[in-house]
Amino acid sequence: MEIKGINHLLFSVSHLDTSIDFYQKVFGAKLLVKGRTTAYFDMNGIWLALNEEPDIPRNDIKLSYTHIAFTIEDHEFEEMSAKLKRLHVNILPGRERDERDRKSIYFTDPDGHKFEFHTGTLQDRLRYYKQEKTHMHFYDETAF
């Protein structure tokens, strides 16, 4: 048995309509179906589901670095950054980043789920770490 890929992403949200608006405007997600407490989207081939659960505490998740990163092209970075600002999206302070690690912008949805738009690839990151992070052990040299 082997994993074929990611099947879908599901996020618990406090207000379904607010979140639908966010995912449509920020990610260009295409709304496929909406129920009383559920919405399904197609996000460029990714199945995204939202479940409204208004009574779940959401305060402490902001302390975690857990996030989902989406690839964007380097030439689209400034445009995407401007779009997030124009939509008044909560943009997070990014970490110090070496240019070899490419560009990233971190932000949250209305419920605090963290996302990143990143211009680099896994291979970019591995090459950079191989040069700079001498304490790391690399197991698969063919990965980059």
Swiss-Prot record:
Question: Is-annotated flag, keyword Metal-binding?
Answer: yes
What organism is this sequence from?
A: Bacillus subtilis (strain 168)
Q: Report the protein name in the record.
A: Metallothiol transferase FosB
UniProt cofactor(s): Mg(2+)
> Domain VOC: where?
5-120
Q: How does it assemble?
A: Homodimer.
Q: What is its main location?
A: cytoplasm
| Residues that, per the record, bind Mg(2+) | H8, H67, E116
**What does the record note about the induction of this protein?**
Expression is sigma W-dependent.
